[in-house]
Amino acid sequence: MKSIILTILDGWGYSENKKGNAIQIADTPTIDKLWNSYPNTLLNASGRDVGLPEGQMGNSEVGHTTIGAGRIINQDLVRISKSIEDRSFFNNEAINSICQKINFYNTKLHLIGLCSNGGVHSHIKHLFALLDIAMRYKIQICIHAITDGRDTSPYGSKIFIEEINNQIQQFNHINICTISGRYYSMDRDCRWARTEKSYNTLLKNTLGFTKDPILMINEYYKKNISDEFIPPTRLHKGSIENNDGIIFFNFRPDRMRQLVHAFTKSTFKGFNTTSFHNLEILTLTQYDPSLDIEVAFPAKKNKNFIGEIIAKYGLKQLRLAETEKYAHVTYFFNGGIEEPFAGEDRQLIPSPKVETYDLDPEMSATKLTESAINAINKNTYKFIVINYANPDMVGHTGNLDATIHAIQKIDKCIKKIWLACQAMNSTLIITSDHGNADYMLDENNEPCTSHSTNPVPFILAEPTNIHTYHLRKNGNLADIAPTILQLLNLNIPNEMNGISLLETKAKNKI
């Protein structure tokens, strides 16, 4: 049985349009040669093909979940939005319960989350639905808005803040109390100084230079501070105190965990925190199964992701990524399961400690590649998942030149990976989870920092049997796992409704 090396180039979409396309502009001789020499196809990685609304760009969480699942799963964005449409959201027991408690104690409800329509970590419609419920109880509501600028345009937050203002301006008991860029409130790389600034602003009633959120944002814009980097600033009094309640309304967990842990973990050591009496906390989805807090939309259990199938056959597997994407090749790839499966090893390569990744576009790709080659050479793993974060993380900075540098670095790394695969007669699969680096200038020639809806490449490179396989067209990310299982000659579980990309007789399902 050959080993399968699944290499995910995060944020590497496919488009023939060269304008603002770091991937087309960059010099990538290795990947170009592999694309031209081996079976390849394009996979849809956005919208309904990955369980998102039509036209919604894909993202790393959804992409890795879909790849690991081998099926299309309705994502939390769709699940929650549908509950708003069918009105079941407004009868949600956990949400109504926390509002009742605030009403009983005559205290404050704090709504904390990313305020945009990006749809990657949150959606502003979910905030408005929460406001609809909370307003029934006539309680004091403090909105703590996190500005985006990453999954939306860098200077687009005023639209969303104005939308919130229009909803609440007639109510004296509802205020936008703080605003903070996601750089501070949604760090996921243990940059505790960032999280601490956000945390302290939530706790202290020290007012900033204005109570007008639009004026405040404009002042930061004048200093060339975009939405993502707006410093945590207080606009109105309404700090978090005893007997208050908090609803964190991001549906994606990875970038809210640090802030939530600061309020909930007794063993938290990131920075000095305050202990609260009777502070009720609710998250829209499950952020961390180890936390003893209420969840409005508990995770649905899924079984027979590819990692579980590999483990059931007693085969060893390895997940390898740097910090920024470690959760994606482990937690998300395994369907929201924190603990590794039997025979599953994990290796974390620390991401560089820089303010933004355009300052170090190579990130930790060299160390990651060295670790991957060592693992391939051991020949003990039948399935290795590698994630290169550079195209996505550098692409998010909007710096085209830095992203081109990142792409060229990845190409050099893939050359080394491919040489190792050839030496060990291992199969190399190159693909991606979503687009980003392929679309870095918008229609106005302004930097675009968000993901694209472009398809992603899929290359099946085998050192031998070059002409054995043909790959079908019109596939999506859910088709990757069945393809790998067929290559390994393992049975495909019934739960996987993805279809193998190999144009040969399909393996029987179990």
Swiss-Prot record:
Binds 2 manganese ions per subunit. The keyword Isomerase applies. The active site is at S60. Keywords: Chloroplast, Glycolysis, Isomerase, Manganese, Metal-binding, Plastid. It is found in: Plastid, Chloroplast. GO terms for molecular function: manganese ion binding; phosphoglycerate mutase activity. Substrate binds at H121, R150, D151, R182, R188, R252, P253, D254, R255, K325. This is 2,3-bisphosphoglycerate-independent phosphoglycerate mutase. It comes from Gracilaria tenuistipitata var. liui. The lineage of its organism: Eukaryota, Rhodophyta, Florideophyceae, Rhodymeniophycidae, Gracilariales.
